[in-house]
Amino acid sequence: MELVAVKEGLARILVPKAERIYDAPVFYNPVMSLNRDISVLAVKVLGPKRVLDALSATGIRGIRYALETPAEEVWLNDISEEAYGLMKKNASLNIDGELYEEGDRSYLWGEKLVVINKGDANRLMAENFRYFDFLDLDPFGSPVEFLDTALRSVRRNGVLAVTATDTGVLCGAYRNACLRKYLAEPIRGPLCHEAGLRILIGTVVRYAAKYDLGVEVLLAYHRDHYFRAFLKLKSGAKKADKSLSQLGFLWADKSGRFEYRRGFLPDKPGASGPLWLGPLKDESFVEELLESARDHPLAHKKTLSFLQLISEELDVPFHYDTHTLARACSLTPPKLDVIIQRLRELGHSATKTHFSPTSVKTDAPFGVVAEVMKNV
């Protein structure tokens, strides 16, 4: 396996040389550096003591946690023998200390403890009940097969950070797969990315409720080919009930009109869901991320601007795609800034959204938005 050096954040690691990243024997995706930037900032702000990167590959995520955050104990895990060897090599390159090996586990002792494990992620999480303050699930595809053990491996009031890269499934391109994996009906069209993210969160909420765990969304977003959510777990049946009460269903038509309602079952045909209808961010948490990002060695040039966009985004369910509305009204789409300004002049809240460059988030009803589109 030929290796090349790459730098990301404060880490300098070795990764396999390959023409296509998916052909490499150990996976490393530079596009996900923004994801890792935000994750590092989250750990820095939250200050957990024990962190697990359950699916580590090269080890870049866990190594950055060890280098760039106050975490005292960081675990890296992968089932691949090649990944295990590379994780040990990369950890030793970046973190001072002596490496001790015991079977399929190595310990790097220095200012912090870095544990490098070769094994099945589900088994590792099952063996460490309520041990980790921050648990990161960043799989290839769906995280569903890891949710039961992950939820039970996080301490009370700990955080589960979960990624899903099966956007085609959650966005409705593979409806049957979404029904199987997420037990939810997806939606196609301009709302698919927000609905897909909310289906993912709704699935975690339903899994967590089995263990009397409620879910508080600190931050959830869509970017590139993936969905990402930082979820604080709250113990107690009442907390679980409260989270379940935030689930519901979405209806949308080709004109861009949508409606949503909370409830355990849909009350009319054509519904998408169940999905999360609660907030997608904790505003104070996002502000802390932004503040921390301004003086942090970020790996991706767009991390700061992306967080800024999310911080300014109106946190209401779903958005109006102005191009869809324009087609329905036989109009040329007006400039988004003009639409937002006019809605604000009418007394409504309105912002851009990270889900789509042609959409507006607003508390204005469909009729008002359509009328603004016709008259600006």
From Swiss-Prot:
**Keyword Ribonucleoprotein applies:** no
Q: What is its EC number?
A: 2.1.1.216
Question: What biological processes does GO assign it?
Answer: tRNA N2-guanine methylation
Asked if the record carries the keyword RNA-binding, the reply is: yes
Q: What is this protein called?
A: tRNA (guanine(26)-N(2))-dimethyltransferase
Q: Which InterPro entries match?
A: SAM-dependent_MTases_sf (IPR029063), Trm1 (IPR002905), TRM1_arc_bac (IPR022923), tRNA_met_Trm1_C (IPR042296)
Please give the function described in this protein's UniProt entry.
Dimethylates a single guanine residue at position 26 of a number of tRNAs using S-adenosyl-L-methionine as donor of the methyl groups.
Species assigned in the record: Thermococcus kodakarensis (strain ATCC BAA-918 / JCM 12380 / KOD1)
- Tell me the residue numbers annotated for binding S-adenosyl-L-methionine: 36, 61, 78, 120-121
MF (Gene Ontology)? tRNA (guanine(26)-N2)-dimethyltransferase activity; tRNA binding
